[in-house]
Structure formats: C-alpha cells, structure tokens
Amino acid sequence: MVQEYDVIVIGAGHAGVEAGLASARRGAKTLMLTINLDNIAFMPCNPSVGGPAKGIVVREIDALGGQMAKTIDKTHIQMRMLNTGKGPAVRALRAQADKVLYQQEMKRVIEDEENLHIMQGMVDELIIEDNEVKGVRTNIGTEYLSKAVIITTGTFLRGEIILGNMKYSSGPNHQLPSITLSDNLRELGFDIVRFKTGTPPRVNSKTIDYSKTEIQPGDDVGRAFSFETTEYILDQLPCWLTYTNAETHKVIDDNLHLSAMYSGMIKGTGPRYCPSIEDKFVRFNDKPRHQLFLEPEGRNTNEVYVQGLSTSLPEHVQRQMLETIPGLEKADMMRAGYAIEYDAIVPTQLWPTLETKMIKNLYTAGQINGTSGYEEAAGQGLMAGINAAGKVLNTGEKILSRSDAYIGVLIDDLVTKGTNEPYRLLTSRAEYRLLLRHDNADLRLTDMGYELGMISEERYARFNEKRQQIDAEIKRLSDIRIKPNEHTQAIIEQHGGSRLKDGILAIDLLRRPEMTYDIILEILEEEHQLNADVEEQVEIQTKYEGYINKSLQQVEKVKRMEEKKIPEDLDYSKIDSLATEAREKLSEVKPLNIAQASRISGVNPADISILLIYLEQGKLQRVSD
C-alpha cells in the first residue's frame, strides 16, 4: 500500500528539520526522509550557531515559531554577545554547541512532533506528472506520494571528498552521498552548479598546551537565542585563541602543489568568506599570521575543532602544520580536514516562496540553493515548510520582504540575483540594518508567526504584554519633566554630560548619547520595575528614533514599488523598448513586482521606467495574455 502525505521533506539537516517541523506545525501531514536517522541536525563543520547576521537569523527563526534557537539554548557550551562595543544594528549572539547533544535534542523534538513522521531512506527520484510533483521514489523502489516535496539535501548531492590527491564519492563526514537524485534533477532540466566547502582537522584536547594560547570565555551573564528561554546555562566551557606563523606558512608553501585547491582537482567554487588555510596563505601572503580558534565539540568528548585551519592538504601535511602552531605542537590529530564538492541548483529558478518555477509544488531549501551555513539553511527550511504546507492546505504562503527580516534579504538575494559562490549572509547585505536588529526580532515577526499558526496563544499573550510595557514606558518618560536641581546635575556630570539649563523631558534626556535608561532611573530615584529586554527596547527605540523613522520612510517607498505587480507569465520578448540584457534577465528571474525587478543585475533604471509605463497603461497584462 502506497503511503500518502501532504508534504515530504528530503533530508534532515538544519534546513530539513525546520522545514519538517514548520510543515507539521501548520497542520500538514509530513514525512521526513533521511539517509541516516542517527545524523539528524548533524554539524559536519563548525560546532557553533550564530554570529554576525547569522545570530539575528536564529532569533528570527524563533520569532516565527521555528526550533533552532530553543535547541541551541538547551545544548550550548558557551554563548557570547558579539560587537557589544558597536551599535545595536550589528550586535549578535554566537554559541558554541555541544554537537552531539544538539543532534539528540533536535531528534527528540522531531520524534515528539505531531503530524511529523520520520523514515530512514535515500530518495533517488521525484515522481512528476504534468510538471507537478506527486511524490518520491527511494533507492529500494518504495514510493511515497504527496502534494508537495521540499528538497533539503545539503552537501550530499553528488558529494565528493577531496584530501590531497585523493577524491572519492561521499557526503559530509564520510556519509553516503546522494548521486541518483542529482541526476534526476538534471534530467528534469534544472541548471546545476558545482560548489565546494571544507573543514579543518580536529585534535585531542588532552594533547593541547593551553598555556601557549589565549582564553576566550563566554559571557558571565545569561544569554539566549529564544524569546521563550527562561533558564540559562552559566556553567560554560572556554574556547582558546592561537595563531599560525612563518613556520606554518612555510609548510603550506612547500606543499601547495599537493593541495587539491591548486592542483586542479577541485572544480567547484569555494566560499569567499570562509577560505581554506592554503587559500588564505596565497591571497593574503602579506599577513604574518592568521587567527585559529580552538573550539570544544562538546562536554563529553576530547575533540577540538581548529577553526580557521580548513584545508584539503594531505593528512601528513596537516600534521606538519599543527606541529608549528603554539599550543598544538604535540597535539594528537583525531580527524583530518578535507574539502567537499557538491551539486547545487541555480537559485534564480525559484519563486520567492522557494517553490521551483519549473515543477509545481516542488520546493528547495538550504545548501542546495547555493548558501553556506547552518543558520541560512534553517531560515530557508522554515520558510519552505511554511509555504509548502500553506499551499497544500490552502492556508496561505508567506514571502518575507527585505525590510521584514534577514531571512527575507537572504531569499531575495538568491532568487533575484543568484549566486556564483556559496552565499553567506552578512549585515552589509541588508539595506535596513537598523530595523533588522537582534533585539527586535520578536517585535518584527511574532505577529506573523501567530497568524501562520506557528506561535501558541500563551506565547502570543506574553509577547503582547511586553509590547504594551514598551509603549507604556516610552509614554511615561515622555510625560515626566526632570528639573535642573543639584541632584540631577551631579548625576549628569558624573556620567560625562553637560549641565541642564532648563527642565527637560525624561525621554529627551535619554536621547543624549551619554545617557542610559539606568541613569534616567537614578535621576528619578526609581528602582527597576521592568524586564531587561523591555528596558533595552525603550532605550534603543528612543535613541535611534530619528534614524529608524528615516529607514521606515525608505521602506514605504519600496513597498509602493512592491505593490506594482508583474504577471508571472509576462512575455518580455514582446516589450521592444527593453534592453537585450534586461529582457534576458527579466525572463530568467520572472520578478513578481517592480521592486524585485529593480534589484536584478543588468536591469537599469531606464528598463524599470519602461515597465512602469507599460504597467500604468495596462499594457503588461495584454503582453502576458
């Protein structure tokens, strides 16, 4: 008897688990198929979650009802807030994960989720009828039928591990690769590219001389990614910092001809922002040293991840490199680093919902779309799961805009601009950074998560209470006038401010650069009555009000452009006035509105003006008809 589901998810990595959970939580009967049930949410590369931009994505996933934040909050060994000396737009959390505990906790969550079924199996083929996906077929011939399919295969598609002059078929960490499914996607007509990533050696902690390294402790205050977390892990493990040196670089130089990167064995394009150590040596040969972070992989293992030493050099050369590094001279290498090549699809073949343009009800998410990183994968998986379930159940799909979330920036970049290298999310990619902050992810997205059925009534009530407290406190400070008495003047001068000439509203005093919410309470001789996150919002929203309002005005302009819809089936070849390059790019991307069209590389303002004229005169509809 053939089993039938609403949604099937292929893969159970960081994209797959979020896709499966989101689909199930929206009420869709969901099947998750994975090559190995023991490797759900496996971390084949760095044992960490978060960092610049990425940490904000994890908060956004949580605000929308996803899982990654809750799981890392329960299983981390260290957590730090980055960029605390900078403005709120670039602050982000980063956690070191206990990679085994993270897997176990995520597997438990998946197994307990209603509507979500898990099965070990390798999908070889999609079942397609009339350009619409109808299910999948495994390598042993079992068929599972469904109304939608989400592919989240990570680096498994035609994966090949490269180490020195050796190259062999493999998924990450020497798991089985997925070869036949990649062939199937090619046969269906998808444009496929070849990308590469890599991982460093792991060493035995007992053999490291930590006295020669610099300790990197976690924060000594409770931190969490999830807005629901109330219990914090304060018993943390440190990381350690060391450096390469001239000796290390000589080993690399002497053996560069053995690197698959430079021997011609690697054909795939590697990540720009996470280069191998040999690539760093060649590209930045003026630098006398490179940072290496020693990151424990968990509480119950001696394996330490040498971040910054990603390499495809032969194993014996990796040992030689380690012997030159302070603290690692006698380190016992437990796993060698390696490079891995894999297939990815050209992401401009997707709609912003992550549904493929070619095959109806087929979605892709994660590294198959050309991204790098667990967080980028999880964000895409969440949205693919939300949209696949929403489409088959007719409960609505959701497209995040560039002003809604970093996840929106990520997906828009992929489907509008494409990528010719593994895509990494950076704060610099977001034009509305001040709106897309770590601290306000819940204020931006919890309403949306609730509307999608991903947020519980209890959580939504707590969120609304927080929002009301923020608004009430801003109003209260706007009504309090502070007098320029000696008590006030002394506190202001103590904190480097200039004396008041007249009375001032508390909210206006808070706007001064040197003032904080704590100082305002000190002047008012009041105790803390609100949660720290409420106080933080009051301070940030007050201090940055002018800049935030400017950003919101820019967003409104773009929204007006987004409201100018373009028919999906528009035949651009019939619009004679368009430049040839613009016609080709518009035909490839098929933008849904004028705003998206304006972001396509090769489409200039003159082309947008022509589209606007056609739109305003009603010609676009006639061209599409």
Curated annotation (Swiss-Prot):
Cofactor dependence: FAD
Pfam families: GIDA (PF01134), GIDA_C_1st (PF21680), SAM_GIDA_C (PF13932)
Any coiled-coil regions, as ranges: none
Domain of life where this protein originates: Bacteria
Gene Ontology biological process terms in this record: tRNA methylation; tRNA wobble uridine modification
UniProt keyword list: Cytoplasm, FAD, Flavoprotein, NAD, tRNA processing
Molecular function GO terms recorded: flavin adenine dinucleotide binding
Subcellular localization, as worded in the UniProt entry: Cytoplasm
Positions of NAD(+) binding: 270-284
Chain sites annotated for binding FAD: 11-16, 123, 178, 367
InterPro entries: FAD/NAD-bd_sf, GIDA_C_N, MnmG, MnmG-rel, MnmG-rel_CS, MnmG_C, MnmG_C_subdom, MnmG_C_subdom_sf
The keyword NAD belongs to this UniProt entry's keyword annotation: yes
Subunit structure, as described in the record: Homodimer. Heterotetramer of two MnmE and two MnmG subunits.
PANTHER family referenced in this protein's UniProt entry, alphabetically: GLUCOSE INHIBITED DIVISION PROTEIN A (PTHR11806), PROTEIN MTO1 HOMOLOG, MITOCHONDRIAL (PTHR11806:SF0)
Family as reported in the entry's similarity comment: Belongs to the MnmG family.
The protein's name: tRNA uridine 5-carboxymethylaminomethyl modification enzyme MnmG
Organism field: Staphylococcus aureus (strain JH9)
Encoding gene, per UniProt annotation: mnmG
